[in-house]
């Protein structure tokens, strides 16, 4: 699987000729991992063991100099990101009301003569306060989510293509292995025949005939007796 950067808008991918290193999220240290995710400003992003951030998002003091600036320090946090105005605006509008704000839901106990005036004041204040809420429906942060989805689809297509290539290579290797095994079995059978012939000749050799003679089976003799001998020069 080709390593790619998970930072928003970053298209860096691993290449042996590029002087860019990729660093996995410190999932074993939730406190540091949380700082990484917060620094990225990607909505609904959850890192996995396959998620990476490239070295271009870290300052020089984040690396260990004795490791050729390829190994991060334990508490290193990425800080070099390029955020668009739309993304920053979406984050600022994502939570228009701070958590400590509270709207009164019940009217205080007042004399009957002051109730109508108090209700009008509360309705006026509530109307002016809640008026900006419809803007939330058109927040541009959906653009960021769409881009994240495109990254995921692109990675999935590349993974599928890589799996198909590996399966094709595996199929070729299996066919090659089968051919070699068949060849080995043929050679083993041929070797057994040669050994059997040699053993037969050793057992059935007649000492009286000398070293130049052997006793052959009748079928082999009938097949060879019609062949003319080759005369010497």
Curated annotation (Swiss-Prot):
It is found in: Nucleus, Nucleoplasm. Keywords: Cell cycle, Coiled coil, DNA-binding, Metal-binding, Nucleus, Transcription, Transcription regulation, Zinc, Zinc-finger. A zinc finger (THAP-type) spans 5-57. One of its GO terms (molecular function) is sequence-specific DNA binding. GO terms for cellular component: nucleoplasm. SMART domains: DM3, THAP. Belongs to the THAP1 family. This is THAP domain-containing protein 1. The gene is thap1.
